[in-house]
């Protein structure tokens, strides 16, 4: 074939492929907006550009996963039109400070440690919730641990009110929908003498005046305990007492768009944590020598995120993402 004919054919092929590519992106963009109820004004061009960059990043990661370079996959979700900075500003609301001198839990030596634990199977865990665009992760982490301890005591699983914590725990140091600390949430319930149910005091993803009503209280805290910042201590305590509140680094895009598999990203910090979650179990895929051990983490970003709202996070890999750095639980 003549070289000029070959080049002409190549150019024609590229030109014809480009409209198909953009048509495909147009369809996916429209479908994504419809799925997540997104409506834009003047900023749609910018949001579309951000979404496309995130989509390309996700697809590149998944190609590398298929080549064995990663242990987890990613997927587009409701956060796709946000930059990383925007996402962190509206979703990761844990206010970090030096740990107060509180009681440190010493796990009993006589506890038999099973090879795997999943407190969901024992009835300790309420369905996955959605914090919305509110810096309220700390409240969801705290209610999750308290829900588990109340179930352990009473045999009844009752969903507790995050809104009660968001609206009422400022005296203990929290900042409502602008962020807070898990231990300060426990301190509020202890000081207040109770916490209302989710049914009586529903969540609406923004701050309001305190509307706590003692007659609707269904939980109390007698004390709370910090766990030494070691994964083995976290494992022993989790197996012994039930779901544990924890703080992690959730700032990376790989976490934001996590879909399934064991989450391990070398860039995830073990010290700079910014998001409250609930540890509900641990286990392993395959043999423990293959770096396939994981923590089972309940998030508060709805069931469309991750594995129906959960994530498997790498376990025993140098406190990956800070999973053991700020773990605690209440007693009731």
Curated annotation (Swiss-Prot):
Task: Provide the alphabetized UniProt keywords.
Answer: Cell membrane, Cytoplasmic vesicle, Disulfide bond, Glycoprotein, Hydrolase, Lysosome, Membrane, Metal-binding, Protease, Secreted, Signal, Thiol protease, Zinc
The name on file for this protein is Procathepsin L
* Gene assigned in the entry: CTSL
The family database entries (PROSITE patterns) matched by this protein are listed as:
THIOL_PROTEASE_ASN, THIOL_PROTEASE_HIS
List the record's Gene Ontology CC terms alphabetically.
apical plasma membrane; chromaffin granule; extracellular space; lysosome
Q: Where does Zn(2+) 3 bind?
A: 183, 226
Set out the biological process GO terms recorded for this chain's protein. Answer: antigen processing and presentation of peptide antigen; CD4-positive, alpha-beta T cell lineage commitment; collagen catabolic process; elastin catabolic process; enkephalin processing; protein autoprocessing; proteolysis involved in protein catabolic process; zymogen activation
The record's section on CDD domains has: Peptidase_C1A
Which positions are annotated as binding Zn(2+) 5? Answer: 249
Catalytic residues, chain numbering: 137, 275, 299
Which residues have a glycan attached per UniProt? 220
- Which residues are involved in binding Zn(2+) 6? 272
Summary of the tissues where the protein is detected:
Expressed in the endometrium.
Please describe what this protein does: Thiol protease important for the overall degradation of proteins in lysosomes. Plays a critical for normal cellular functions such as general protein turnover, antigen processing and bone remodeling. Involved in the solubilization of cross-linked TG/thyroglobulin and in the subsequent release of thyroid hormone thyroxine (T4) by limited proteolysis of TG/thyroglobulin in the thyroid follicle lumen. In neuroendocrine chromaffin cells secretory vesicles, catalyzes the prohormone proenkephalin processing to the active enkephalin peptide neurotransmitter.
Species of the source: Felis catus
The record ties this protein, via InterPro entries, to: Papain-like_cys_pep_sf, Pept_asp_AS, Pept_his_AS, Peptidase_C1A, Peptidase_C1A_C, Peptidase_C1A_papain-like, Prot_inhib_I29
Q: What is its main location?
A: other
